[in-house]
Amino acid sequence: MTETKEEKVHKVFEKISPSYDRMNSVISFKLHVKWRKETMKLMRVQKGTNVLDVCCGTADWSIMMAEEIGPEGHVTGLDFSENMLKVGREKVKEADLHNVELIHGNAMELPFPDNSFDYVTIGFGLRNVPDYMQVLREMYRVLKPGGQLACIDTSQPNIPGWKQVFNAYFRYVMPVFGKFFAKSYKEYSWLQESTREFPGMARLAEMFQEAGFSYVRYISHSGGASATHFGFKKKEQ
């Protein structure tokens, strides 16, 4: 029987969870931290707010948001991989944060009422879901009117030369890094496939608008290796 994308992705992240953080830094040359900081600066996150971090993984962004909003705010991190959440919970404990809750759940059907969160974030997760539009609509649904979505993910560079280097790196080098550092050649081969198939920046911005978001914009990082898209849920008239 053919394995669904959801089943395949779940299997990948359950296996690579122990080495995920180290591999993130190896693959991106630690640039993922810089990209997240650039995004946070542009978000202008307010203290004491309510945040949902979708596909939170090992909770890097959940922790950054929790530190930014302060003890009066609250962050809920959601992921469908229990093994990734286990790593994340240890990191939250080490950071001594009491305003973070990590829960098991599916981004395709967020277990929250409409209009629940001031901010929704998703970092390097959208490309791995079975249906991009379904997840975008779900994130729109749970945002409060006036709330903001920020999505960081890999993208498609269009600079001649750099595009070819980027594609070759993800296709040939990244799986080898996965084998060497994490004994996971097959899993990192899959991750480069999901990167290659993910929509480019302009198309993803259109999808944000189709899902209902307003004031959509995006910035590229490192020559288009990744991008952050921002969108707002319009305030009720």
Curated annotation (Swiss-Prot):
Its EC number is 2.1.1.163. PROSITE patterns: SAM_MT_UBIE, UBIE_1, UBIE_2. Disulfide bonds: none annotated. The keyword Protein biosynthesis does not apply. InterPro entries: MenG_heptapren, SAM-dependent_MTases_sf, UbiE/COQ5_MeTrFase, UbiE/COQ5_MeTrFase_CS. Coiled coil: none annotated. S-adenosyl-L-methionine binds at residues 58, 79, 106-107. GO terms for biological process: menaquinone biosynthetic process; methylation. Keywords: Menaquinone biosynthesis, Methyltransferase, S-adenosyl-L-methionine, Transferase. Pathway: Quinol/quinone metabolism; menaquinone biosynthesis; menaquinol from 1,4-dihydroxy-2-naphthoate: step 2/2. It catalyses: a 2-demethylmenaquinol + S-adenosyl-L-methionine = a menaquinol + S-adenosyl-L-homocysteine + H(+). One of its GO terms (molecular function) is methyltransferase activity. It is an enzyme of class 2 (transferase). Methyltransferase required for the conversion of demethylmenaquinol (DMKH2) to menaquinol (MKH2). Belongs to the class I-like SAM-binding methyltransferase superfamily. MenG/UbiE family. This is Demethylmenaquinone methyltransferase. It comes from Listeria monocytogenes serovar 1/2a (strain ATCC BAA-679 / EGD-e). The gene is menG.
